[in-house]
Amino acid sequence: MKTLLLLIPLVLTACGTLTGIPAHGGGKRFAVEQELVAASSRAAVKEMDLSALKGRKAALYVSVMGDQGSGNISGGRYSIDALIRGGYHNNPESATQYSYPAYDTTATTKSDALSSVTTSTSLLNAPAAALTKNSGRKGERSAGLSVNGTGDYRNETLLANPRDVSFLTNLIQTVFYLRGIEVVPPEYADTDVFVTVDVFGTVRSRTELHLYNAETLKAQTKLEYFAVDRDSRKLLIAPKTAAYESQYQEQYALWMGPYSVGKTVKASDRLMVDFSDITPYGDTTAQNRPDFKQNNGKKPDVGNEVIRRRKGG
């Protein structure tokens, strides 16, 4: 029981996770970051259900959340030296004896038949000798523990990498091709596919306990997509989401190690808000409004702009 009571404050004191400002990577990525971003992107794109587009020619429109920005992660890894430190200092007793010289002064006073003699002894105000004696033992003891691990956590500036968007777009096109869906210019397409990428970036965090420490890097990709038939304006694919995250983590003990390194890829939580529950207004008069009914036999008029593009005019 006593051991448990001692461990509770040791584990709970000075605990916390320092999370860096989320950013979209950039600059020259290191290999682990490249691997994580690629893994989350591939997993999210691979999850897209494109079965309704089999055999179709699709025009692809990809829109990615702005990925420009910067942030600093500052502060060093804490040292346990400030928590465990003690010292003992002992000085011997010291006594000093001063020897001051003495001198006698004699004064004689005479008046007629009377006379007096006065004698006095005085000390000089400066010692003639000094003797210092020390008694007892002198000792000094100190104890401490300093663990700095791999040193301070350096400042880092995260910049934008425009090639990330191009990489993600190429992944989507690759999946379309492998699924048997041809991606063509808009003027030759019979289907419009819209992909909105809401989250596409990395998050760094650091966990610090007295005995356990961890460095974690996550990459997240979250997107929403839907498809519309060019002629009928029907929704071939209602709005759907795909979200995945990959993680790289190093685990330390007193910032020594890492004793464990792990990589994982898993489905992430979905978008906080999506468009899967949006339907057209019932009283709309728009000619080209989306048709949410499947196989209803209706074929709304195609707008003039669509006809013009069909004819190549």
From Swiss-Prot:
Record bears the keyword NAD: no
Signal peptide from the UniProt entry: 1-14
Lipidation positions, renumbered (N-palmitoyl cysteine): 15
GO cellular component: cell outer membrane
Sequence ranges of Polar residues compositional bias: 282-297
Membrane topology qualifier: Lipid-anchor
Keywords attached to this entry: Cell adhesion, Cell outer membrane, Lipoprotein, Membrane, Palmitate, Signal, Virulence
Stretch list, region Disordered: 282-313
Protein's GO biological process: cell adhesion
Compartment(s) of residence: Cell outer membrane
Transmembrane segments: none
Highest taxon listed in the record's lineage: Bacteria
Sites of S-diacylglycerol cysteine lipidation: 15
Family, per entry: Belongs to the MafA family.
Name of the protein in question: Adhesin MafA 2
